[in-house]
């Protein structure tokens, strides 16, 4: 029997399960903003910096791509410590520290004049991006959502993809003025936009007097949800084949994505002969397909008729 609930009513129920906007969705919006900042200013603009740094200092692509590779190593090694820090101090503090490092790193980048200083600055930026980015944000989202967790994660990731669409703006700034000016402005944007935004992040729904997904549950149901999360530890996870298969698949995917991020724009400028802005426009097409993928994810995780009722 078809549901009598309209799509608009379903959306309203999703975002306002108790007559007001569930605070978890504000956290998702903030996460999307932070992902946007990290994506447009650094992760997806790194190829632009390799081009301008190669032109100014004649550093080889091997040296420049090596710096990016070290950031990925740093991210992997920092992961376990980062998880402990978030559990110990909460995501808001860790995000703030990370964004401060991220912003300062860009201000230092605008003054770099040697390969050693560049590598040290990239290290500061990469630690800042890790602490003030995806993994820390996901801790809050996972705590705030259960039934709608997939949708919440997908919506938060929209920020990163939208950041990729805006990479041509960064390229235009580098061509119109100078990459050092762009780096300095980027540092200011991170501090002025990112740090105030993450002050609204909360670790768990209880801190705002709310419940998971914004749905009022009976006491025994709340206990069941908490026990389900607490009973499956990281030690249990590493014993399952699924953990290692997902990790391997994710690692292979990131290898491909990282290669495109670092080498696509340099290839289009040096190999094909395009201008920096033209190359970035072609690069931004990657983000369009990312958005399509996220859209499919949201489509296939839409509420079932049973959930809407």
Q: What spans do the regions from the language model cover?
A:
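Central cavity-lining transmembrane alpha-helices of secondary-active solute carriers
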Residues: 69-82, 284-296
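Extracytoplasmic gate region of multi-pass secondary transporters
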Residues: 46-47, 241-284
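Extracytoplasmic
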Residues: 26-51, 59, 260-265
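Intracellular juxtamembrane helix-capping segments at the cytosolic ends
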Residues: 132-145
């Amino acid at each position: 029997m078809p549901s009598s609930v309209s799509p608009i009513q379903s959306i309203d129920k999703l975002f306002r399960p108790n007559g007001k906007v569930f605070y978890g969705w504000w956290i998702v919006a903030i996460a999307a903003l932070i992902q946007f900042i990290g994506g447009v200013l650094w992760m997806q603009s790194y190829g632009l910096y390799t081009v301008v740094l190669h032109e100014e200092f004649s550093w080889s692509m091997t040296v420049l791509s090596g710096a990016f590779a070290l950031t990925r190593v740093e991210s992997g090694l920092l992961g376990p410590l980062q998880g402990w820090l978030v559990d110990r101090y909460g995501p808001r503090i860790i995000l703030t520290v990370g964004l401060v490092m991220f912003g300062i790193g860009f201000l230092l980048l605008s003054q770099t004049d040697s390969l050693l200083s560049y590598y040290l600055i990239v290290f500061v930026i990469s630690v800042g991006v890790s602490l003030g980015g995806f993994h820390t944000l996901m801790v809050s989202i996972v705590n705030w959502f259960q039934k709608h967790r997939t949708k919440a994660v997908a919506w938060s990731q929209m920020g990163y993809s939208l950041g990729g669409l805006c990479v041509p703006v960064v390229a235009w700034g580098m061509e119109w003025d100078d990459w050092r000016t762009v780096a300095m402005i980027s540092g200011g944007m991170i501090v002025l936009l990112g740090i105030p935004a993450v002050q609204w992040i909360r670790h768990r729904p209880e801190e705002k007097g709310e419940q998971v997904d914004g749905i009022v549950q009976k006491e025994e149901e709340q206990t069941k949800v908490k026990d389900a999360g607490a009973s499956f530890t990281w030690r249990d996870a590493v014993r399952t084949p699924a953990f290692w298969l997902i990790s391997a698949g994710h690692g292979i995917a990131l290898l491909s994505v990282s290669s495109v991020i670092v080498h696509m724009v340099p290839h289009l400028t040096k190999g094909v002969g395009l201008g920096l802005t033209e190359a970035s426009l072609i690069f931004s097409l990657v983000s369009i397909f990312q958005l399509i993928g996220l859209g499919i994810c949201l489509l296939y995780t839409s509420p079932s008729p049973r959930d809407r009722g």
